[in-house]
Every structure is written in structure tokens, then in C-alpha cells.
């Protein structure tokens, strides 16, 4: 049996925080605002996995009203999500992710992100694709006010 999940997330850029995307710290003058470390890509991946497994979303599992998740490492949240998926008897087929950001440039960090996501999903890096695009300076991402990400995941019974 195959199941497909889709994830989407957005975070505002702000001063005074590190920029962590896909589990990788990226040198930049701003970081993403959020209750956890605000890793927009790992949140998207986690949401896609939860959706595919029929287990809701990250807000259900890690509410931003719970102090336990204040400044949480999103990689640890992803590992927790993947354990839920595994307990239901699924393995990763593949995942395709898109980061939507005007800046900074993501290309130098894509390979490291793929490896980190593969690690979190206990998969081979060949099963993980990450790409980035801009919105040609249109909208909040185009004005560099925030960063968005989306992902589609395929899981299958082990």
C-alpha cells in the first residue's frame, strides 16, 4: 500500500536568530521566527509525513503553546514523527521538497540538507530531493520577509 502526503510551511525572517533550513545552519543576517528553531523545511517534511500516515499535523503533535517545544530542534521533532510513521509499518518511497526564498541562495546547502533529511527519515539520500526557487521578487518571499517550503512524500508498507 502506498500513501502520499503533502506539507507546506512559512516562517517570517527576523533579526537575532540563526537561519536553520533542512537541519543546516545557513550564514545569513536574519533567521526564521518561530516557537521552535523555525526550520521551515523540516516542518514541511514532518507535516507531509504525518499527512501520509493519517496522523494530523505538527501543530497537533508539537503545539506552539507547549513550553516543552520552545526553541526545539526540528530535527528531533522530525525523528519523532518518523517513529510514528514507522510504527504504522511504513518506509519512505521518496520525498520531493521545494524551498521558496528570494535570499539567501540555497544551492550551496542543498546537498547537506538532502543528507540531513535522509538521516531523519532513515533513508538513502537518493530518496530525497530538495530544490529551491524564488518568486521573482513578488510577494512576501520575494521581498525577503519570509521563507516558505513545500514537500510531497510517498510512503509504502514495509
Curated annotation (Swiss-Prot):
Site (Transition state stabilizer): 35, 134
Residues binding a divalent metal cation, per UniProt: 9, 11, 43
Family recorded in the similarity comment: Belongs to the IspF family.
Cofactor details (free text): Binds 1 divalent metal cation per subunit.
Organism: Bacillus velezensis (strain DSM 23117 / BGSC 10A6 / LMG 26770 / FZB42)
Protein name according to UniProt: 2-C-methyl-D-erythritol 2,4-cyclodiphosphate synthase
Cofactor dependency: a divalent metal cation
Gene Ontology BP, a term: isopentenyl diphosphate biosynthetic process, methylerythritol 4-phosphate pathway
CDD domains from the UniProt entry: MECDP_synthase (cd00554)
Residues that, per the record, bind 4-CDP-2-C-methyl-D-erythritol 2-phosphate: 9-11, 35-36, 57-59, 62-66, 101-107, 133-136, 140, 143
Pfam families per record: YgbB
UniProt KW keywords: Isoprene biosynthesis, Lyase, Metal-binding
Catalysed conversion reaction: 4-CDP-2-C-methyl-D-erythritol 2-phosphate = 2-C-methyl-D-erythritol 2,4-cyclic diphosphate + CMP
Subunit structure: Homotrimer.
EC number, as in UniProt: 4.6.1.12
PANTHER family in alphabetical order: 2-C-METHYL-D-ERYTHRITOL 2,4-CYCLODIPHOSPHATE SYNTHASE, CHLOROPLASTIC
Keyword check for Lyase: yes
Lyase as UniProt keyword: yes
Role this protein plays: Involved in the biosynthesis of isopentenyl diphosphate (IPP) and dimethylallyl diphosphate (DMAPP), two major building blocks of isoprenoid compounds. Catalyzes the conversion of 4-diphosphocytidyl-2-C-methyl-D-erythritol 2-phosphate (CDP-ME2P) to 2-C-methyl-D-erythritol 2,4-cyclodiphosphate (ME-CPP) with a corresponding release of cytidine 5-monophosphate (CMP).
Pathway: Isoprenoid biosynthesis; isopentenyl diphosphate biosynthesis via DXP pathway; isopentenyl diphosphate from 1-deoxy-D-xylulose 5-phosphate: step 4/6
Entry GO MF terms: 2-C-methyl-D-erythritol 2,4-cyclodiphosphate synthase activity; metal ion binding
PROSITE patterns per record: ISPF
Highest taxon of the lineage: Bacteria
InterPro entries per the UniProt record, alphabetical: MECDP_synthase, MECDP_synthase_CS, MECDP_synthase_sf
Coiled-coil stretches: none
Amino acid at each position: 500500500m502506498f500513501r502520499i502526503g503533502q506539507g507546506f510551511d512559512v516562517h517570517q525572517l527576523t533579526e537575532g536568530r540563526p537561519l536553520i533550513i533542512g537541519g543546516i545552519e545557513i550564514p545569513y543576517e536574519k533567521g526564521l521566527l518561530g516557537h521552535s528553531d523555525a526550520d521551515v523545511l523540516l516542518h514541511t517534511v514532518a507535516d507531509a509525513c504525518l499527512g501520509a500516515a493519517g496522523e494530523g499535523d505538527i501543530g497537533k503533535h508539537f503545539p506552539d503553546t507547549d513550553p516543552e517545544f520552545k526553541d526545539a530542534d526540528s530535527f528531533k521533532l522530525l525523528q519523532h514523527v518518523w517513529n510514528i510513521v514507522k510504527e504504522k509499518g511504513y518506509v519512505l518511497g521518496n520525498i520531493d521538497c521545494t524551498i521558496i526564498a528570494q535570499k539567501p541562495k540555497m544551492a550551496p546547502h542543498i546537498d547537506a540538507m538532502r543528507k540531513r533529511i535522509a538521516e531523519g527519515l532513515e533513508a538513502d539520500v537518493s530518496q530525497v530531493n530538495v530544490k529551491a526557487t524564488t518568486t521573482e521578487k513578488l510577494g512576501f518571499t520575494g521581498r525577503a520577509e519570509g521563507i516558505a517550503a513545500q514537500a510531497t512524500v510517498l510512503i509504502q508498507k514495509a
